[in-house]
A protein has these predicted regions:
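C-terminal recognition in membrane/secretory proteostasis and scaffolding
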Residues: 1-176
Length: 176
């Protein structure tokens, strides 16, 4: 798997809608070859790196601990056309605190009618889309249920931060 490299802009061209038994996908292309950041690590809990410049909308969001996450309504921030992310309604259906499941901590369901109409639910390319609940970052999308494309798994933001710290420490050691 790709472990390091440049981060470049991407633009979405179309959506292959997910249906029962066949996952959908966001289809796009790299917008240009200009690096906007560097990927340092690619592991089970996500990809980690840094941006050369902060994004235009750089409003800080508090990170929730896994014990602050509740079943119920939440929002996903994802891009399904062009390059502009939007918020969509989801439901956190269940929470799994088992340490053996680093990236399958929550079962989520897309409830937003617009997102369901356009994508059929969770599609390939949505992995990493942030999940917010009560104004805090609680996690990110990781998997789609192939036979129920409106549902999938998500990881706790707390688990992602732990790997970010570990990844940063490893890269600091390599650079030294």
């Amino acid at each position: 798997s790709l472990s390091q490299g440049d981060i470049v802009q991407a633009k979405l061209d179309s959506i292959t809608k997910g249906i029962k038994g066949t996952p959908g996908a966001l289809n796009g292309h790299f917008d240009n070859d200009v690096a906007i950041g560097t990927l340092l690590s690619n592991c089970e809990t996500g990809v980690y790196g840094y941006m050369e410049e902060s994004p235009a909308d750089n409003t800080p969001v508090e990170v929730a601990s896994k014990h602050e996450v509740r079943t119920g309504s939440a929002k996903i921030l994802t891009t399904i056309s062009g390059d502009q992310a939007q918020y969509y309604d989801i439901e956190i259906e269940s929470i799994n605190y088992n340490q053996d499941t680093a990236s399958k901590n929550m079962t989520i369901k897309i409830t937003d009618e617009t997102l369901l109409e356009k994508t059929g639910g969770i599609v390939q390319g949505m992995s990493g889309s942030p999940i917010l609940q009560n104004g805090k970052l609680v996690g990110a999308v990781t998997h789609v249920f192939v036979n129920e494309p409106e549902k999938g798994y998500a990881i706790f933001s707390e688990n992602m931060l732990a790997d970010l710290v570990e990844s940063t420490a490893k890269n600091r050691d390599i650079a030294a």
